[in-house]
Amino acid sequence: MTSIKTEMPPLHAAEALASSSATDSGGGGAGGGGGGGGGGSGGPGAGGTGGVGSAPATPNATISAAADSSDNQPGTPQPTQQQQSTQQQLQQPQSQQQQQQAMGGGDPQQQQQQQQVTGITHQPYATHHMYSASGGQQQQQQQIYGGLYGGDMQQQQGYASSYINSYEQFYQQQQQQQQGTDYAFGTVGVDYGKSAGVRYHPYLQTPTSGLGGIPTASSAQEEAGSAPSAVSTTTAVAMSPRVVSSSSPTSTSSHLQLGSSSGQTPGSPGGAAGSAGCKLQCKKCGILTTNESELQEHIANVHGESPYGSSGYASSPYIKEEMPTPQPPGVGSATANPGELLDLDSQKMVYHQQLLQQQQQQHDVVAGLPLGALPDPLHSMQSMQQRALHSWEQQPQQTVASVEGLPPYMQQGLGVGLGVGVDKSPYYSPKQSPYHQSTGVGGATLIKQEYGGHGLIKSEYPDSQHYVDKSFDPTAGGAGGAELCASVATSPAEFPSTTTGGPGQEGAAGAAPGGGYRGFEPPSSSSVLPANSLTAKAATWKSNEARRPKTYNCTACNKWFTSSGHLKRHYNTTLHKNAVKSSGQPDPATLPISAHHHPARDPVTKPSRRGNAAAAAAAAAAAASASGQGQQQQPPIPPPPANVPPPEPPRSPPDYGGGGGLGVGAMGGAAMSQYSASPSPTQQQQHHLNHHQQQANGYANGTANGYGYMQQQVQSTTNASPQHASNNNSNNQQQQQQQQQHHQQQMPQHHNSVLNGHPNGLAGPSAPHNNNTTQMPSSQMRGLLNETTTTPPPTTTTRAPQITTTATTTTTAATTVAIKSEQMEDSNHTHTHTHTHPNHSHSQDRSHSSSSSSSMATEEAEEQELRDQEQADDHLHQHQQASQQYLLSARHYHSSTPNTLSSSNTNPSTPSSNSPHTIYRQEQQGTDFSRTTPPPQPLPPMGMLPPMAMDYNMLALDMPMPMPTLMHSNMLQCSSTSTTPLATTITTSMPDTMQPPQQQLVHHYQAVLHPLHQQLGEQHQRQEADHHQQQRELHQLDQQQQQQQALILADSLPHSSSSPTSSSPPPTMPMPLTTITAPQLLPLQPPPPHITSTMPMPPTMHMPIMPPPPQCYQQLQPLDPTMSYHTIIGSGPEAHTGTAGGGYSNQITTSDGQILQLMPTSLFAPYAPLSPYSVAAQRSPQEGDLPPVHTLTTALHAHQQGGQQEAQTPTLTVLSTPYSPTVSSSRATPALEMDMATLMQHHQDYEMEQYQMQHQQLDQMQQHQQQLDHQQQQQILADQTQTMAQQPLAKKRRGGNATPSTTKRRRNSSVGSTSPHSTTLPSGRIKCLECDKEFTKNCYLTQHNKSFHSGEYPFRCQKCGKRFQSEDVYTTHLGRHRTQDKPHKCELCPKQFHHKTDLRRHVEAIHTGLKQHMCDICEKGFCRKDHLRKHLETHNRPRVVGKKSAAAAAAAAAAAAVTATAGLGGAPAAGSIKAAFARSLTVTAVSSEPGAGVAIPSAPATATCAPVSVSASALVQAVNPSLTSGLSLKRHIDDVAVDDDSLLEEDEDEMEMEMEMDMLEEEDEEEEELGDHHMIIKSEYVQEEFQMIEKSIELY
């Protein structure tokens, strides 16, 4: 309960809330008691309503937060009167408690409640009232979930109120909540995991115990030691309609959770419940989805509208959730009809939401989300969050129950986190708070502290920018409820992040206990603010308009733009130029626009107030989400900035300082103003606390879930800020993913939400995630971020044991950690967070190490981190101390990562452990913003890895190589972003050790974590093997891999849900493990997966820590730059499975339901044939000419599944394969084109030959053609004979090689030796099939191939397309384009030339008037041979694939029609084709009768495959030469000799046929099936034509 307090607004707000709460007593009489203990947060929410008036008491009455919610926040929907009254009851005591807590004693929740009750009405911002209302609910929820969860929810509620009312208020509330959170951390004894059992559906006015909801609340209550907890839960029930429904159109409005939380196991709260226990129904179309992520995906894909508009604002769902007559948190209408306030879908959502609300209420209870309270906060944040809403929409599935109505930040805090955490979630502070609560055992207190940072929150909140910062804060705030969630939720910009965070929060609050009540978070994600409510409208100036997401980021100014044009225009502004000068970083304008385009950035994330604060907040929130633990969440975006490139990553300057503060101080540092570069200790504390809570609450799962969800959001946000994303993603994602795994196990929905909710978030973070890979920020950013999310779960895991071991201590530690985390978040958000969970000291170390970002430190830290994890149990206690230290050190502002890192390193043993993570994180950050973050660079290996981090999928691929045995799990870990694998790995170890602890979930991951720590520390390798085995066991038990998959893939969420995620224990197990590993990140074996996510960790680093991880990382390293993602459309269960099984954490589900499959380039390479060309096409200088990873998902899946069982080693191997644009496969696709082109050219030069051959075949044509052919053939006859001899070889080669480049022309007889990708043209010139360039000598071709088709040529001339390896050469080359005066000028015209030969050729061709090169077909003359060559291509042009096909079909038809002639050439065997070809060449020289000619082709054809086709061709030619001309390409050519026009057409046809024959023949050789076609084509062509075809094939 105490934890809730932090979230509570001031007493006056609390009072208002209390009255509201009383009104909402629907929560139950117990609610009153719970309010006292766990209703601190709830207090504000209920109090706010009460303060506004008793009127809100009506079930629908929104906690209008009286005057407070005045900003543009609609009144927050109040829970039912019963709930409100209950809340009031709870809140009043809570207010007292809050006061006490504020005094430093007593239940923070009570204090908050008192504050709210007494001050809510007076609070300047309705936010507090809203918060109060939500606080009351939170109280109820807390009761249900225990003080912890309820506290979180309350906080979140209070937070929501603040949020809705105004940024300032929101921040204040957050601060309050933070304060309360701290208290809650210590006070709350209940795990959210336990307490998360109950979830209040927004529409259901009763608690749904998806998690064992009420019983969970009871357990939470017991743990919290306060009956009020139960009350809180009840209240939450009444209020539950609040967030879930409203929060995300997709989540709440878009889907109804049928089966709701109640159907779920306690392990999976609302979100999980939705995914595990209930089917979610799309409110818009009624479609039922398995989990929220699916729903989100569906909503995003089908009901896309605007993320915000579509679902209205989270607050709107909120209102709906308050359902009875919930007003949107609009300031004014306390009793406004929910429908009235709902935007767009809100009304629809209201009713659906009512049902949803019931389910979500349960979720809410689970998530500890006060529905009523959330709406108001949502409103204030809504506009900002609206953008995030989109991603949130998808994510809402996970957090749908509680988060739906809330803004993403709120939802995260509320839905994802625990009541308190949720409250915080809306802002950075609440977010962490939720995590603290999530840490559950000790989390509540921390959350309270975060809220205790109420003033801070307010302070930040008032500022718009700060509001955004709060977004970041929510990142931190999300810590409580899956810090991430809160973190993301905090800031509208971060909504996606919030969504991610939301799940985390939910996971923290409900995930651990009930799979983290994911429902909360997803809503955030989907449209955290989409809930149609005034808040949505008020908060967002265009709440209902679908606006273009701001995907273009100016890293120097942290500004986001909707189009590249706007960005370019911005580059010309003085503001930008000054920023660049002051930053000392290279001007981003010099980079390709693609480097600044982060499509993954969800509209939600980036749109809301992206300007500065919003963007920063969003980034922070997203980062926090990514961190999956408030700490990481907040810093991730800011941390990178803090590191060095802070400016770049942050959405906005506030993001930077505030971002750091947000990230770091989001929870405890909500107060820390997101503006401030350094996160406040509180934030970090909260983050840590949140992490801790998650773990304590079994939130390993919840956190993972919530975080995972948030992470996606974060990713989206991160996308906006690469650094942010990278850091966030790297660690955050790791954590988040791991958490997601846990959470997914509990709440697959949650996971889904994360991925789905924030497709872009997913994608977006990818690039930032790979600091290194800034080159391909958008793609990598997109893909990898998600995986990185996994790391948070490990953190959670570590934390969980600690929590289990010492709830109170853990709480304290969590609190410190939260702050530390937040700070870390700034600098090493993910690492800190991750480490936080493994142990506080770990967090600190990580944070510091991250700051240090020294390779040595990283490796050392990794190893130590492993040890730390070993010592996790011991360290947990230490961790608390360390955490505190860390907080202090982190206070250094992880923003200034280096310093913080050093500080963190203070903890010798833990820091070492953490250090690696931190470093890793730093590296991530550094890599992400390598240009801006020097500190990260200290991890050069990581620097290389960052891209990997970006492409952690690749990492996953890589991972297999070193750890065949572990590879299975390890690889999974790697590939699943170390989500599942990490979780799996750690889980395996931890389960035995930690099963008894806290909760099964927590225990599992704790056990995994501790054992992992111990084992890793003691014997990383053995541990890894053990983990691997255990992971497998766990995988089997928990289907961790599946969970990982789910985590990795939002779509997979359902899978996750069905698999272990569904069950609390399995999720916890895998999640925590992942989390721990993630934090250690790669240092541990599990980390490798994370490393996949968090590429930044250098393989060496990983290796030192865990041999297997290093493997992963090692391979990853080379690949990271090549990492890319493949978009998979459709549900991701299979994909997820592939990921989990395949060990590819590359699949990321985007908010729009797309599943991005990240594939290492090397993986891609093996499948190069699939899209080598596309790779080449896609390659861009910025991507370093690495092959896109868009290679078939199939390949990836194959890799994944193969890799999963140590098959990943092969995958790694594949990865290792260097990308070569000229891969034969690449040629494969172009083969036809090349063949055709080659054939055309061949025809051009060889046409005469063909004509002659045809002419020979066709008497008329034969004579004319023979003359020409004789001339040509006699010249080339020797060559031809050679070719004939060689052609079989060439042909064989063709068969063996997809792109053999035998010469098509007879002259090519020697072409065979040219190169596999070249062909000799009839003219004797050698043509490069890769780029169609021609050369007179082989040496030129060789030189050309070396220069253009091998190795990496990153410098590409935009004018002529030439590529250069070195910048010097490239610069020199560019000079030539610029040079106006070229040395050689034409005396007859103004033209100038660089080379004398060019001038001479020009004069001869243009000015002499001599046209000595004549076209044999049309008799046109050309002054230059190359002109003639080009012209000849026009004759062959019609011979395109299509024409070829038509010609082939015609030939086939003719063949069928004329079967009589089939016997003509039946004698020759298949081998005779080549002979025929040779013969045809001979025939060409010696005019052969049509019959003879036909016989030859027919024989080969017959021998090869289709006698009929042969006969047809033979028949056509033999029977009717003139008919043949039409049917047979060859004959056309011959005819052409006679009739130019007809020849042209025929020639074209012949070319087509020939090309088809070439291809067919090639295929024939490869597959006999194609023999028929080849035969047909060959038949159609006379022997001579066959020769041509043969040559063509050779070319192929």
UniProtKB/Swiss-Prot annotation:
Keywords: Chromosome, Developmental protein, Metal-binding, Nucleus, Repeat, Transcription, Transcription regulation, Zinc, Zinc-finger. Residues 904-1297 are annotated as: Transactivation activation domain (TAD). Gene3D superfamilies: Classic Zinc Finger. GO terms for molecular function: chromatin loop anchoring activity; DNA-binding transcription activator activity, RNA polymerase II-specific; DNA-binding transcription factor activity, RNA polymerase II-specific; nucleosome binding; RNA polymerase II cis-regulatory region sequence-specific DNA binding; sequence-specific DNA binding; transcription cis-regulatory region binding; zinc ion binding. A zinc finger (C2H2-type) spans 552-576, 1326-1349, 1355-1378, 1384-1407, 1413-1435. Changing residue 554 to S: Hyperactive mutant allele, leading to increased expression of target genes. Residues 60-72, 673-682, 768-781, 921-932, 1276-1286, 1309-1322 have a biased composition (Polar residues). Its main location: nucleus. Residues 1-143, 209-273, 490-530, 578-813, 825-945, 1017-1074, 1252-1322 are annotated as: Disordered. Residues 830-840 have a biased composition (Basic residues). It is found in: Nucleus; Chromosome. InterPro entries: Znf_C2H2_jaz (IPR022755), Znf_C2H2_sf (IPR036236), Znf_C2H2_type (IPR013087). It holds the Pfam family zf-C2H2_jaz. One of its GO terms (cellular component) is nucleoplasm. Residues 864-877, 1019-1036 have a biased composition (Basic and acidic residues). PROSITE patterns: ZINC_FINGER_C2H2_1, ZINC_FINGER_C2H2_2. Residues 25-53, 501-518, 656-668 have a biased composition (Gly residues). Detected in the germline cells of the ovary, in unfertilized eggs and throughout early development. Later, it becomes mostly restricted to the nervous system and specific head regions. Also expressed in imaginal wing disks in third instar larvae. Residues 635-653, 933-944 have a biased composition (Pro residues). Transcription factor required for zygotic genome activation (ZGA), a critical event in early embryonic development during which the developmental control passes from maternally provided mRNAs to the expression of the zygotic genome after fertilization. Binds to regulatory DNA sequences containing a 5'-CAGGTAG-3' sequence motif, which are highly enriched among developmental enhancers. Within 1 hour into development, or by the embryo's 8th nuclear cycle, binds the majority of its motifs genome-wide. C2H2-type zinc fingers mediate DNA-binding. C2H2-type zinc finger 2 serves as an inhibitory domain, and is essential for reprogramming the early embryonic genome, but not for its functions later in development. This is Transcription factor Zelda.
